[in-house]
Amino acid sequence: MDNLKVMVVDDESRMRKLVKDFLVKKGFDVIEAENGEEAVDRFFETKDIALIVLDVMMPKMDGWEVCREIRKMSQVPIIMLTAKSDEKDELFETKIF
């Protein structure tokens, strides 16, 4: 049986490594992207991604934009990570779902 594929997207390599190491230990295959544009490209190039772990604040294309692009074609589960603490930011952006 093939392992489930998880895409981890974060512009900080330490954060990607932390999440990747945890997921690999749990038996997942991990695909990495370091910015939003790369994430969208990799998502549509790769078959069968089961979950996306997505940073909100990134260069080129932020996590909310990535989510909007992917939602046009897929309902893959997405976990959003953020260092933002302002509840207004969270509530404003959740309308994309």
Where does each model-flagged region fall?
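Conserved phosphotransfer cores of two-component systems
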Residues: F44-K47, E69-V76
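Short acidic/polar segment at the start of the alpha1 helix of CheY-like receiver
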Residues: E12-R16
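Active-site residues of response regulator receiver
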Residues: D55, T82
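Acidic catalytic/metal-coordinating carboxylates
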Residues: N35-E38, D62-E65, D89
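Charged docking surfaces used in two-component/phosphorelay signaling
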Residues: K17-K25
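Acidic, metal-coordinating helix/loop segments flanking the phosphotransfer/catalytic sites
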Residues: E32-L51
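Non-catalytic signal-transmission and effector/linker regions of two-component phosphorelay proteins
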Residues: M1-M7
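Receiver (REC) domain active-site loop signature in two-component systems and cognate sites
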Residues: M58
